[in-house]
């Protein structure tokens, strides 16, 4: 069942994105983005270019991050898995914040709780969820062009994300989407603090930048723009595709197919590629 649904979602995505057809050119005006070459030229002015991951370098072919959990639940044969998984993560975040003042959690910690309170085998759960991420994550075609242009110019590229996946997990995901050759990867759960508090930017400035100029590219106006600027970084806002496309997308569709449809249309029309 999981495989059938996954393949159906991919089939819809390929048709909408035109992967199996000659590529239609989406104009600068229709996508609302400057050309990738224009953005790359702006970023070339800085010594170090930093990228966010989800909704910036990588896009999910689903309209919400938690929609991945629907497919995990289907694969594991567990009803109401989405609610269970989402609630367990937030329970753990609240408990850690009350105990140590940090909301950062790891993938392994989440599934330790899932096993303890929900009876989900931690190893099987982690494998199923990460495989689902691999199945539904793709490179943002627009940002991939920008990334490759900068890399060809020999620029220093770092990747910075607030995420529960460890560096090892994220390296696999980035590689599966074609991102190789970046200089450093910083993940919040490995430090116990993230971009949201500004502390991860501060840490990178102190231990990695050594006074070099830096600009961060990301989709969250508070986390990727305001907090970066507060720490003395320049920032380039990339509005996420779902915010741009949401008002045009139908909502009266089944959860799985509707999520895939909305996501793939948003990628096609609003990524900038």
Short names for language-model regions:
Residues 151-158, 163-189:
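Substrate-recognition/cap helix-loop segment adjacent to the acidic, metal-dependent catalytic center
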Residues 1-30:
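Membrane-proximal basic amphipathic "stem/tether" segments
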Residues 38-86:
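Active-site neighborhood of HAD-like aspartate-dependent phosphohydrolases
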């Amino acid at each position: 069942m999981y495989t059938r649904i996954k393949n159906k979602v991919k089939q819809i995505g390929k048709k909408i994105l035109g992967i199996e057809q000659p590529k239609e050119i989406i104009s600068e005006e229709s996508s609302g983005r400057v050309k990738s070459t224009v953005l790359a030229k702006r970023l070339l002015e800085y010594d170090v270019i930093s990228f966010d991951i989800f909704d910036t370098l990588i896009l999910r072919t689903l309209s919400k991050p938690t929609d991945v959990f629907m497919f995990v639940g289907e694969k594991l044969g567990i009803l109401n898995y989405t609610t269970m998984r989402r609630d367990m993560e937030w329970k753990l975040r609240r408990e850690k914040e009350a105990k140590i003042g940090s909301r950062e959690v790891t993938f392994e910690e989440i599934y330790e709780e899932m096993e303890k309170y929900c009876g989900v085998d931690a190893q099987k759960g982690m494998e199923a969820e990460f495989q689902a991420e691999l199945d539904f994550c793709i490179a943002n075609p627009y940002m991939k062009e920008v990334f490759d242009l900068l890399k060809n110019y020999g620029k220093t590229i770092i990747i910075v994300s607030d995420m529960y996946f460890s560096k090892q997990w994220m390296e696999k995901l980035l590689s599966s989407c074609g991102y190789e050759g970046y200089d450093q990867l910083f993940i919040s759960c490995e430090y116990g603090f993230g971009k949201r508090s500004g502390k991860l930017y501060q840490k990178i400035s102190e231990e990695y930048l050594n006074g070099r100029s830096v600009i961060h590219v990301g989709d969250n106006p508070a986390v990727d723009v305001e907090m970066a600027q507060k720490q003395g970084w320049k920032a380039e806002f990339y509005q996420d595709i779902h915010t741009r496309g949401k008002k045009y997308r139908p909502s009266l569709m089944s959860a799985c197919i509707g999520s895939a449809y909305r996501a793939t249309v948003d990628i096609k029309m609003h990524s900038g590629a």
